Each structure stands twice: as structure tokens, then as C-alpha cells.
Amino acid sequence: TNEFIRFASSGIFEFYKDVAKVKCGADKLLASLKEQNIKLCLASATAMSEVKYALECHALSKYFDFVISCADIGIGKDRPDIYIKAKSLMGIPEGEICVFEDSYVALETAKKVGFQTVGIFDRYNFGQERLKKSSDIYLDENQTLDCLIAMIDNK
């Protein structure tokens, strides 16, 4: 029913506001990339209203040039459509795009169409061993995004 959907949605917004945390070093990494004028697109499987809410709650909107959702595309990340749309929006060849994912299904989809990939551990997603195996770079549970900042700053 609509009442249940409203109730469930309100719980999701509370989760993003009170429970969900920004991954360690993510804000520094985004700031570093933005300072270097690197285009950033957030391509999420989450509904756009929830994505925008989460970005605002954590003051991350300012880093992204584009934000797209699978709901807008009409298909999940098991198909490359959202990545192809992101590439089109950014105007960059796939070989120059790096996709960050915590889902092995999404990461493998991006990799199949030629994107570089960074797998990021997420305790809420199963298949971490497969994610690690499929990633060009993998950041484990105890690693932070700070190591990527150092790699980018040294280029």
C-alpha cells in the first residue's frame, strides 16, 4: 500500500541521515579530484530522491558534476546502460574513466565494457572475495581511500 511505501521510505531517509557514514577518506578523495578538475559522476542503483538526500546530508553534492540513478535509466547495474550514460554525460572515453563500486555485479559490468575499476569493501554487500578478484584496485575493510589520494596526487 502507499502508506507502507511512505513508511519504508521514511526509514531509508533516517538511515542516510543517522546511520550511513561516508567511507573513510571519501570526502578528501572527492575534494582532491575536484581540485584537479576531474569530472565526477555518481551513478547509483538507489532512487534519485534518496541519493540526493544522502549527498546533502553529508555535504557531498558539491563534488559531483552529474548524478544519475538506475531508476532514471530503467535498468539495473547488471547491464552497462548507467555506465554508458555516465560516460556520455562526462564526454570521456571509457578507458579514462574509473568506476568505484562495492558490488561485484556492478563492477564486473563496468569492467566488461572497458572501464577501469576500484572495488571498495562494504560490509553490507556479499561477494567481497569476487569483488576483490574482479577489481583493478581493491580497498579492503581496513584500508581507506587515503591511499588513492596519494596515488592521484603523485601523478
Feature-to-residue mapping (PLM):
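Short, structured helix-loop boundary elements
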Residues: T1-I5, K23, D27, S61, ...
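Asp-based, Mg2+/Mn2+-dependent phosphohydrolase catalytic module
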Residues: A31-K34, A47-M48, K52-K155
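Non-catalytic, surface-exposed connector residues within folded enzymatic/regulatory domains
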Residues: N2, R6, A20-K23, A45, ...
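Short, basic/glycine-rich phosphate-binding loops at helix/coil junctions
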Residues: E3-F13, D65-V67
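Short, acidic loop-to-helix structural element flanking the phosphoryl-transfer center
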Residues: S10, E14-L42, M48, K52
